[in-house]
């Protein structure tokens, strides 16, 4: 084992974490400048491993923590890692090995802490010390670690100090501790023996005094014995008399009880009847309350609503009938007016039809006369123009040129007229198509307004609206009925909820408040945590049904177990219990089914074999199979018997519980429990049954209420749907009516467009006629010019032309006359036609349209709709009348039911009053029996008290000897016995100062004397053993010192010869009474234990006085000198030799030397270095030095650097180490 690694942090000058790794298991040398921190490194190791830094004060701990610039350091720690492949260190319990042959010891110190850690586990310093001792590192050896100054101190040590060092190595302190403890115990033994001797003297004196008291006590006891005999005889006679009187009273009591049984049975029957009548009366009152509060009010409200509805229907029927009559009258009036207007229109149209042919004829004649006149005028103009134009020309060519130009113009004009005609023809064709399209659109619009599809659609809408309104009325009636039903159910639910709460209170009264709160909170927690009902089943009492005959048995056996909550698993129970604990919600007991098992050992005996009639209670309990374990767990070992005595036998024999129908029970241990049970007092099972029934009814009504509310939601949805459908159909109907109005507007627009088209067509026709006329004129003029080209040139008109000109004048005049006559006739006819058209278009036709529109709006569909509405209202009236009849009947029925309930209530109250009166009479009779029984019981109680007093007095007399009961004093009366007893009491009173504890005290003190004698003997034996132990301890100390000194002396001589080959040295131990000059002889120590033992047990005698050193450095034969006579370097050699000799006696696995060669001469430094090299083969050495001698033989080298007041350690090689020593120390080689 050796030190492998040292980690220092915050310790003295080592501020930062400093890791010194890779120590050699042999020799290691640490170098560094003065003040760099070498000694602090050794102090760090001593801080962990030695006692030098134990029990540190706050100031001392603060001195170990680095104090420097920069951030403050709050703690210091040193960690030493040992390489222990042989596992020589035995780790304390609880500390695990790392598995890498390393053991880590760490000590951390702060201002308020001082902790040790071993392999990262907190341990005590004692654990560290014991572990190091197992590895050979002893705290008794002060030279495993040799700091600076230790060599100098040993060099200048006195003989006594060297002896103390030798004793420390031996472990003499432990001998001294044991020796002091033995001497202390020896002294305590002497004190105890003196005290015992003193007590023995006092006891002997006391015993002599007690002998006289003992004799007086014997006389007193004899008198007391006779007195007890007399007392016993008197008490026994009186006790027999008391017992005889009690037996007579018991007979009277039994007779009285037997006589009252008939009345008690009758009282039980009356109790049952009163209970039944009370329950029935409560039920009647609840029903009557519901009838009055709900049924009657709803019936009245319904009758009132239906009456009001019937009145509203009658009013609506009257209104609709009036609308039908008014619309029919107006329709007849409008029809007559329309017929008259149509007749007038027809007359005007017939008149127009008669005038129009003449108008057309005159129009054609006028056009023809105009054309003729225009033609004649054009010819006249042409001839006149020809006369004037031709006069301008001088030759034919000039004329012809002009004519050709005119011909070209006329041809161009004719062509334009032809083109215009084609365009006008096309326009006329387009207008005619538009006219036809407008005619078709007008027909379609008329069909859309008055066609059968539209009328049928409106009729369908009206029919559907009637159906939907009827459906809506039915739904509203249904909703009202559901509302009434809901109100009734809510009233019933409130009543049932009150019953549930009352039954819950009744159940709670049978248990503790904490348990009641717990059961209520369990249900809340189950709902809150959403635990399945298949996991929490309820209380055991709710899960079973018991025959009424055996209900008392189940009640007594079940007890509080009836309120235990049955769950599926313990996980469920734990979950609920944790929540109960969190909310402080009471206490409950759970029965997890998965933790129960059926007891196969339960075997009921056969009725035939036992000849005792019994019934297993479990057979009278009904439950679901899944709860079998829980039910059998509580009731499975119980049998019901008629007689408790026989049941007790069965219970003991078969390890069962037996119970009677009255509730008296016996368990398998023979314990009997019983007494009076009030059969009419509400029991737990009955309360649980009533609670379950009320909850069941409440749940049923709640489900019905939920069903009604769901139906209400459905009917509300249905009503919304019907209202939606009504709105949709109404909107569709309004949409159709709106479309009809749009169609009418479009029809008027189309009619106006038709008139405009007619006017446009007439204008085009006039244009075409005018165009034909112009084209005819142009063609004639063209023909004239072409004809003129063929004539000879003449500037004057020809004779024919002149005659034609004159003829034309006459023809024009005649044409004018004809045109004027025709125009005048046409104008008169046109005026008449315009007047007729204006009357038709402006007056008659609009009136016709208005009346037709009005009659269309208020047409057959509207009338039919009103008629349908009237039929619907009449049907509704019939339905409402039937509803009214039913409502009246229902109101009468409810009133009759209420009257019946009131009558039944009155009868039951009378019956209850009668039963109560009879009950009072029975109770009075029983009260008389009770008073008689009480008097008997009072007498019996007095006698029982007297009997107990007599029995107590007899017991106080105690046991009497058998010879005392031989004489029964039958020939002596009680008075005589009493006189003898008084005389004896007088004699006893004379001995009232006798010590009644004399026998006991004498015996006690005698035993005390024997005990003291035994203790004195034991103390003598203990004293002898302690004296033997003291002798042995002294002898062991002397032997240990002698043995260790011999070893150290031999090692010292050998080591000194290695260091100083030419010299010699030896150790001399001095014993008391030795002559001071006898230093030249080695002493052979022989201690005589007997002669050195002090008489008072104190170790005041010192065997040895010191250890001195005798040496010679030049010759083995020269006179040797004492160490005080040597030089400083020679003293250091002796000190080192002594340290190494001590270490060889108690070898350790590692050693630390801090500059042990500082004061040595050159030759001795080399010898020490060589010796350490040899010793390092079996142990690890870590040394500091300022010389090069150790560097020549060491294995590892480390340098301590000091910068910015902070120490660090680095590893260097041999050359770097030697170079540093030579460079920093000019005496390195000296």
From Swiss-Prot:
Q: What is its main location?
A: nucleus
Chain segments annotated as coiled-coil in the UniProt record:
172-482, 685-1041
Superkingdom of the organism of origin: Eukaryota
Q: Which Gene3D superfamilies match?
A: 1.20.1060.20, 3.30.70.1620, P-loop containing nucleotide triphosphate hydrolases
- The record lists ATP as bound by 32-39
A GO molecular function term, named singly, is: ATP binding
Residues covered by the SMC hinge domain: 535-651
Q: Residues annotated as region Disordered?
A: 1078-1097
Q: Tell me a GO biological process for this protein.
A: reciprocal meiotic recombination
Location(s), subcellular = Nucleus; Chromosome
Record's GO cellular component terms = meiotic cohesin complex; mitotic cohesin complex; nucleus
Record keywords, A-Z: Acetylation, ATP-binding, Cell cycle, Cell division, Chromosome, Coiled coil, Mitosis, Nucleotide-binding, Nucleus
The subunit field of the Swiss-Prot or TrEMBL record says:
Cohesin complexes are composed of the SMC1 and SMC3 heterodimer attached via their SMC hinge domain, MCD1/SCC1 which link them, and IRR1/SCC3, which interacts with MCD1. The cohesin complex also interacts with SCC2, which is required for its association with chromosomes.
Give the family per the record.
Belongs to the SMC family. SMC3 subfamily.
Written domain comment of the UniProt record: The flexible SMC hinge domain, which separates the large intramolecular coiled coil regions, allows the heterotypic interaction with the corresponding domain of SMC1, forming a V-shaped heterodimer. The two heads of the heterodimer are then connected by different ends of the cleavable MCD1 protein, forming a ring structure.
Q: What does this protein do?
A: Involved in chromosome cohesion during cell cycle and in DNA repair. Central component of cohesin complex. The cohesin complex is required for the cohesion of sister chromatids after DNA replication. The cohesin complex apparently forms a large proteinaceous ring within which sister chromatids can be trapped. At anaphase, the complex is cleaved and dissociates from chromatin, allowing sister chromatids to segregate.
Q: What is this protein called?
A: Structural maintenance of chromosomes protein 3
């Amino acid at each position: 084992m050796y030190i492998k690694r040292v980690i220092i942090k915050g310790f003295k000058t080592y501020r930062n974490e400093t890791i010194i790794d890779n120590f050699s298991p042999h020799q290691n040398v640490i170098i560094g400048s003065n003040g760099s921190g070498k000694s602090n490194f050794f102090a760090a190791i001593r801080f962990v491993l030695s006692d030098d830094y134990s029990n540190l004060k706050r100031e001392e701990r603060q001195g170990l923590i680095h104090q420097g610039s920069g951030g403050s350091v709050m703690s210091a720690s040193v960690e030493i890692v040992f390489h222990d492949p042989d596992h020589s260190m035995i780790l304390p319990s609880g500390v695990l090995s790392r598995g890498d042959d390393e053991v880590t010891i760490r000590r951390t110190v702060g201002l308020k802490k001082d902790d040790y850690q071993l392999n990262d586990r907190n341990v005590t310093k004692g654990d560290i010390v014991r572990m190091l001792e197992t590895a050979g590192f002893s705290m008794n050896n002060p030279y495993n670690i040799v700091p600076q100054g230790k060599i100098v101190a040993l060099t200048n040590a006195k003989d006594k100090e060297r002896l103390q060092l030798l004793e420390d190595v031996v472990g003499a302190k432990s001998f001294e501790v044991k020796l002091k403890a033995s001497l202390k115990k020896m002294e305590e033994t002497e004190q105890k023996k003196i005290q015992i001797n003193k007590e023995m003297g006092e006891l002997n004196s006391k015993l002599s005094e007690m002998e006289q008291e003992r004799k007086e006590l014997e006389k007193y006891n004899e008198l007391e014995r006779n007195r007890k005999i007399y007392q016993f005889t008197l008490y026994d006679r009186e006790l027999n008399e008391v017992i005889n009187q009690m037996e007579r009273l018991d007979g009277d009591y039994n007779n009285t009880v037997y006589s009252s049984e008939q009345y008690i049975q009758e009282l039980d029957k009356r109790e049952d009847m009163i209970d039944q009548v009370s329950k029935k009366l409560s039920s009647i009152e609840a029903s009557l309350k519901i009838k009055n509060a709900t049924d009657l009010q709803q019936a009245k409200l319904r009758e009132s609503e239906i009456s009001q509805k019937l009145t509203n229907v009658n009013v609506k029927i009257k209104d609709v009938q009036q609308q039908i009559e008014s619309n029919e009258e107006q329709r007849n009036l409008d029809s007559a007016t329309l017929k008259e207007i149509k007749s007038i229109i027809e007359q005007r149209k017939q008149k127009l039809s008669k005038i129009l042919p003449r108008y057309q004829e005159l129009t054609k004649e006028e056009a023809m006369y105009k054309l003729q006149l225009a033609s004649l005028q054009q010819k006249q103009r042409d001839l006149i123009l020809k006369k004037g134009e031709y006069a301008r020309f001088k030759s034919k060519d000039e004329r012809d040129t002009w004519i050709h130009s005119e011909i070209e113009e006329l041809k161009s004009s004719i062509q334009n007229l032809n083109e215009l005609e084609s365009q006008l023809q096309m326009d006329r064709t387009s207008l005619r198509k538009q006219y036809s399209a407008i005619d078709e659109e007008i027909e379609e619009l008329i069909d859309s307004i008055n066609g059968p599809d539209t009328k049928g659609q409106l009729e369908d809408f009206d029919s559907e609206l009637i159906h939907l309104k009827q459906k809506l009325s039915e739904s509203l009636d249904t909703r009202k009925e559901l509302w009434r039903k809901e109100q009734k159910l809510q009233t019933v639910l409130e009543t049932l909820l009150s019953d549930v709460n009352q039954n819950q209170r009744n159940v709670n009264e049978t248990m503790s408040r904490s348990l009641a709160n717990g059961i209520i909170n369990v249900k809340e927690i189950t709902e809150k945590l959403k635990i399945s009902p298949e996991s929490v089943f309820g209380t055991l009492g709710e899960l079973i049904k018991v025959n009424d005959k055996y209900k008392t048995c189940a009640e007594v056996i079940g007890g509080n177990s009836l309120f235990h909550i049955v769950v599926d698993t313990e996980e469920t129970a734990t979950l609920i219990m944790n929540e109960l604990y969190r909310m402080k919600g009471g206490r409950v007991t759970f029965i997890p089914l998965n933790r129960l098992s059926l007891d196969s050992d339960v075997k009921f005996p056969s009725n035939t074999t036992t000849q005792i009639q019994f019934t297993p209670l479990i057979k009278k309990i009904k439950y679901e199979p899944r709860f079998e374990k829980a039910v059998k767990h509580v009731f499975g070992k119980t049998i019901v018997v008629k007689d408790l005595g026989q049941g007790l036998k069965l219970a003991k024999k078969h390890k069962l519980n037996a119970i009677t129908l009255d509730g008296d029970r016996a368990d398998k241990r023979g314990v009997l429990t019983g007494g009076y049970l009030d059969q009419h007092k509400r029991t737990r099972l009955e309360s649980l049954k009533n609670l379950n029934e009320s909850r069941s009814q409440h749940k049923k009504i709640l489900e019905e209420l939920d069903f009604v509310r769901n139906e209400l939601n459905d009917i509300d949805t249905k009503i919304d749907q019907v209202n939606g459908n009504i709105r949709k159909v109404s909107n569709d109907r309004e949409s159709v009516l709106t479309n009809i109005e749009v169609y009418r507007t479009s029809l008027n627009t189309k009619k106006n467009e038709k008139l405009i088209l007619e006017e446009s067509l007439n204008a085009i026709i006039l244009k075409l006629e005018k165009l034909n006329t112009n084209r005819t004129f142009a063609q004639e003029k063209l023909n004239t010019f072409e004809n003129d080209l063929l004539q000879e040139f003449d500037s004057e008109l020809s004779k024919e032309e002149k005659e034609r000109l004159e003829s034309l004048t006459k023809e024009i005049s005649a044409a004018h006359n004809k045109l004027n006559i025709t125009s005048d006739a046409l104008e008169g006819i046109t005026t008449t036609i315009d007047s007729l058209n204006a009357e038709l278009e402006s007056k008659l036709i609009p009136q016709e349209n208005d009346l037709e529109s009005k009659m269309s709006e208020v047409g057959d569909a509207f009338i039919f709709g009103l008629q349908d509405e009237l039929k619907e209202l009449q049907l509704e009236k019939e339905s409402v009348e039937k509803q009214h009849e039913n409502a009246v009947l229902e109101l009468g029925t409810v009133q009759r039911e209420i009257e019946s309930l009131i009558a039944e209530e009155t009868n039951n109250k009378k019956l209850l009053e009668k039963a109560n009166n009879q009950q009072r009479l029975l109770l009075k009779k029983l009260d008389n029996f009770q008073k008689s029984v009480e008097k008997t019981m009072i007498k019996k109680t007095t006698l029982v008290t007297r009997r107990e007093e007599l029995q107590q007095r007899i017991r106080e007399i105690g046991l009497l000897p058998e010879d005392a009961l031989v004489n029964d004093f039958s020939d002596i009366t009680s008075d005589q016995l009493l006189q003898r007893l008084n005389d004896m009491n007088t004699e006893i009173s004379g001995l009232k100062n006798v010590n009644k504890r004399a026998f006991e005290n004498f015996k006690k003190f005698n035993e005390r004397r024997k005990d003291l004698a035994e203790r004195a003997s034991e103390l003598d034996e203990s004293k002898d053993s302690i004296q033997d132990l003291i002798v042995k301890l002294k002898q062991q100390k002397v032997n240990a010192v002698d043995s260790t000194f011999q070893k150290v002396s031999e090692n010292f001589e050998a080591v000194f010869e290695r260091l100083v080959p030419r010299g010699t040295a030896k150790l001399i131990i001095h014993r008391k009474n030795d002559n001071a000059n006898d230093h030249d002889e080695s002493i052979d120590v022989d201690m005589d234990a007997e002669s050195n033992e002090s008489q008072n047990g104190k170790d005041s005698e010192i065997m040895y006085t010191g250890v001195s050193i005798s040496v010679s450095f030049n010759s083995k034969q020269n006179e040797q000198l004492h160490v005080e006579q040597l030089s400083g370097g020679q003293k250091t050699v002796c000190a080192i030799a002594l340290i190494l000799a001590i270490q060889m006696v108690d070898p350790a696995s590692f050693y630390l030397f801090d500059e042990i060669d500082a004061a040595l001469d050159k030759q001795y430094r080399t010898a020490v270095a060589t010796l350490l090299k040899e010793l390092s083969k079996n142990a690890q050495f870590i040394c500091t030095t300022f010389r090069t001698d150790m560097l020549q033989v060491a294995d590892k080298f480390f340098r301590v650097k000091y910068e910015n007041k902070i120490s660090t350690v680095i590893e260097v090689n041999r050359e770097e180490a030697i170079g540093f020593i030579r460079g920093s120390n000019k005496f390195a080689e000296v």
